[in-house]
Amino acid sequence: MSNSIVIQTSSTVIEDMKQQYKHSLSPKTPQGGIFMAKVPSCTITAYKSGKVMFQGGRAEAEAARWQTVSQTPKTAVKKSVDSHRYAPPASIGTMSIVGSDEVGTGDFFGPMTVVAVYVDAKQIPLLKELGVKDSKNLNDEQITAIAKQLLHVVPYSSLVLHNEKYNELFDKGNNQGKLKALLHNKAITNLLAKIAPTKPEGVLIDQFTQPDTYYKYLAKQKQVQRENVYFATKGESVHLAVAAASILARYSFVKQFDELSKKAGMPLPKGAGKQVDIAAAKLIQKLGKERLPEFVKLHFANTEKAFRLLK
């Protein structure tokens, strides 16, 4: 029997949901709707009124992932994602900062990696000389070359959430936004302990959700970093600490990805496009469906598409 659950939430959470389900979005949106997404055994429809409907066999489980962050006021002023009390000061680019960033969240294959890096203000010219900039503008070869030098120059904390653990935590009701928040907080906490008694002038997180939502995700954590913590989208262009974190996170991700390809005995593509569906179908044929959780993020729509290719 098909279940149907409706929750009332904020526009911020709905934006988070849309980002979370971006690989499963339906081209059709009902009247008054913001988006419709179809994941295995559940259809999610978000409306401009703030209501979100979950329909299907997994409606209850899927809705539960969002109910913990949905208790926010119904009325919200529409503003820029960077318009909040956690915005960094104008002078942050010249300060001694811990920066954090993540890689792998949009890839079906491979883990999620988060890195926090401490950059002393005196090191900024050196990092520029090494070619540190937004990792999206660098190829894997350049990433490797710069990362190998960075590892000996800056203190850092690197965390890898492997696929099996990722899927296990996701099945327990943790959406991707929450997993990112947990890893960022942990990497920053680890790094602050590592560099003590040195205290950075601030912490800059490459913003992936509204700061208030980030802290809601961390509500049950014993240690949460709040002192001089700032959030900014495109953090790599705000401070080189985030750019360095992005490079080290991608370096770690590429290494993990190569290991995963060796384990699979076949090259695995990055991203979440059609080539990924084909590779996943081949992997299922080769190793069996029970091994799939070791390689992929199961909640992506690619899982269903891969199985469809095998029919």
Swiss-Prot record:
Pfam families: DUF3378, RNase_HII. Manganese or magnesium. Binds 1 divalent metal ion per monomer in the absence of substrate. May bind a second metal ion after substrate binding. It is found in: Cytoplasm. It is an enzyme of class 3 (hydrolase). GO terms for cellular component: cytoplasm; ribonuclease H2 complex. Endonuclease that specifically degrades the RNA of RNA-DNA hybrids. NCBIfam families: rnhC (TIGR00716). This is Ribonuclease HIII. It comes from Bacillus cereus (strain ATCC 10987 / NRS 248).
